[in-house]
């Protein structure tokens, strides 16, 4: 009789864990960010079981290009700023996709939305001066917003647009340092 009771309890606990654990992230294209790789790439948990990630995907933020980590000091600063923006969202973001959903390297391409205040994180990186505009058709849904955000940060001299700002665009830096990529 006791064994039956314990088996039943364990089964109920297992079912509760299974039901409350999102199988395909959270509803409404919401995902937990598990890692920030640099100022424009994160990892999200897309499948989990009882809170443990089973599948993680890399997401490249559409429309922006942040300095590379080896572009001192702006690469590290961009990564730190993206972490700050994600922490304001409790590391849970809504991911919106555009027409092309993956890049040549297999990363997902997405717009990250702060679930708490509704801000577009890609746009905030531009507006705060930690990334440059980097749009490629057909993924241009928010390109007008991004152009205006970069103009605002540039005119205010924020981040990479300040006195000791970025000396080289990230794309140009990658071209001149192919050994790192």
Please provide the spans of the model-predicted regions.
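Small beta-barrel nucleic-acid-binding modules, primarily SNase/OB-fold domains
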Residues: 2-14, 19-181
């Amino acid at each position: 009789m006791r064994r039956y009771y314990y088996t039943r309890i364990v089964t109920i606990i297992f079912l509760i864990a299974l039901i409350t654990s999102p199988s395909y992230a959270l509803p409404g294209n919401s995902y937990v960010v598990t890692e920030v790789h640099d100022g424009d790439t994160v990892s999200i948990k897309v499948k989990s079981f009882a809170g443990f990630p089973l599948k993680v995907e890399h997401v490249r933020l559409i429309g922006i290009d942040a300095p590379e980590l080896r572009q001192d000091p702006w690469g590290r600063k961009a990564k730190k700023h993206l972490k700050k923006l994600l922490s304001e969202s409790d590391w849970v973001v809504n991911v919106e996709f555009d027409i092309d959903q993956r890049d040549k390297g297999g990363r997902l391409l997405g717009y990250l939305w702060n679930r708490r205040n509704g801000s577009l994180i890609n746009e905030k990186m531009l507006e705060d001066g930690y990334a440059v505009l980097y749009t490629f058709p057909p993924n241009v849904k928010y390109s007008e917003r991004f152009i205006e955000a970069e103009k605002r940060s540039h005119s205010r001299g924020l981040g990479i647009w300040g006195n000791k700002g970025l000396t080289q665009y990230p794309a140009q830096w990658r071209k001149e340092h192919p050994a790192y990529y």
